[in-house]
Design a protein with these regions (language model features):
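Ferredoxin-reductase
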Residues: 2-95, 147-149, 160, 177
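Short, surface-exposed secondary-structure boundary micro-motifs
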Residues: 48-50, 101-102, 363
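FNR/FR-type flavoprotein reductase catalytic core
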Residues: 84-265, 275-277
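Local cysteine-cluster metal-coordination motifs and their immediate loop/turn environment
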Residues: 125, 301, 305-330, 340-355
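Redox cofactor-anchoring modules in respiratory/redox and cofactor-processing assemblies
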Residues: 228-302, 318-323, 351-364
């Protein structure tokens, strides 16, 4: 199963740095509700590909919901097909296929005090959170922003303007590897030690996030006030059999010898019927007929529930839920770490029942 995708027109392309550009989409009035989002969420974009028709990539929204703007920011990477294509080919007036906003890297209360850590292009969702907190919240915002050098600082001008406008609420600390070297665990811990009552959000390269997260743990930041976003490249196709994919498949079918067999679906630990209680959007639902023949996400969709998701491949955290009672097994997991799993967090798109009764919440 897939969700509906939409062709959106690019209204503006902004060159932020030599390697980063922001892309602004026009969302028609009839899709306003469909593309409503909260700070920290992302869009899944279909980037054209001659081989497969498209490749799916998730890019964080760097704009704010209250601005009415839908802007993603893409940093070009050396071996990144999608980012290089978007930098080399995309212009204002072009269209891209896009899925509605998704993701759980979002603050629950904009009035909180925030400690934000961003490394490189990890600033994109963090910028949305910072702007939203400053413009719609009432707390303090502290941003630690690490980059290779001064020329690689995305949103340098915008951050300077925000710091001037909110001088009594915003502190921005720039850390440049070319000047100060990589931030050490001790330096990160010493910095965070001044803000142990704040809610922390971390996004950037994996080593940076690990160093920050380890520092926060040592300072006894509770899990509820520690959030991190991992950037991944999706390997599957969440867009379904759209025109671009069918056209590419037709070309492949011409040379397919037809001898290959598809993979057998993995067997569920429990074949049902399984009883599952689900809390979603503040409402309780109980079902007693999960046969264990499909993942939790698909089962809930069959029941008419609007459960969150994006990639369906276990490569993003959009469908994350918390298992309060019972057990599930995941067919694939590329984003949840050991601490997530210990806390009961699971990916609904990959979760198969491993007990006869389950209690699950999406409000964790």
């Amino acid at each position: 199963m897939t969700t509906d995708s939409y062709l959106l027109t690019v209204t503006e392309v902004i060159e932020e740095t030599e390697d980063a550009r922001s892309i602004v989409f026009e969302v028609p009035p009839e899709l306003t509700d469909t593309f409503a989002y909260v700070p920290g969420q992302f869009l899944t974009v279909a980037v054209p590909s001659e081989r497969t028709g498209l490749v799916a990539r998730c890019y964080s929204l760097s704009s704010t919901p209250h601005s009415g703007r839908h802007q993603i920011t893409v940093k070009r990477t050396v071996d990144g097909y999608a980012s290089n294509w978007l930098h080399a080919n995309l212009r204002a007036g072009d269209t891209l296929r896009v899925l509605p906003p998704s993701g759980i890297f979002s603050p629950k209360d904009l009035d909180d005090d925030f400690l934000l850590f961003a490394g490189g292009s990890g600033i994109t969702p963090v910028m949305s959170i910072a702007r939203s907190a400053l413009e719609k919240g009432s707390g303090q915002v502290v941003l630690f922003y690490a980059n290779r050098d001064e020329r690689s600082v995305i949103f340098a001008g915008a951050l300077q303007e925000l710091a001037a406008r909110y001088a009594d609420r915003l502190v921005v600390v720039h850390w440049l590897e070319s000047v100060q070297g990589l931030p050490s665990a001790a330096q990160l811990k010493a910095f965070a030690a001044h803000f142990t009552t704040y809610t922390a959000f971390v996004c950037g390269p994996a080593p940076f996030m690990k160093a920050v997260t380890d520092s926060l743990k040592e300072l006894d930041f509770p899990r509820a006030r520690r959030h991190q976003e991992k950037f991944v490249s999706l390997g599957g196709n969440p867009f379904g059999e759209v025109e671009e994919v069918l056209a590419a498949q037709a070309v492949l079918d011409e040379v397919d010898d037809g001898d290959e067999e598809g993979d057998e679906p993995g067997a569920a630990v429990v074949t049902g019927p399984v009883t599952v209680e689900v809390e979603l959007d503040g409402e309780q639902h109980t079902f007693d007929d999960w046969a264990g023949d499909k993942p939790l996400l698909e089962f809930l969709e069959d029941k008419g529930l609007d459960a969150p998701f994006s990639c369906r491949e276990g490569q993003c955290s959009a469908c994350a839920c918390m298992v309060l009672e019972g057990e599930v097994t995941m067919r694939n997991n590329e984003v949840l770490d050991a601490e997530d799993l210990a806390d009961g967090i699971r990916l609904a798109c990959q979760s198969m029942p491993a007990s006869e009764k389950l209690r699950i919440t999406y409000s964790g």
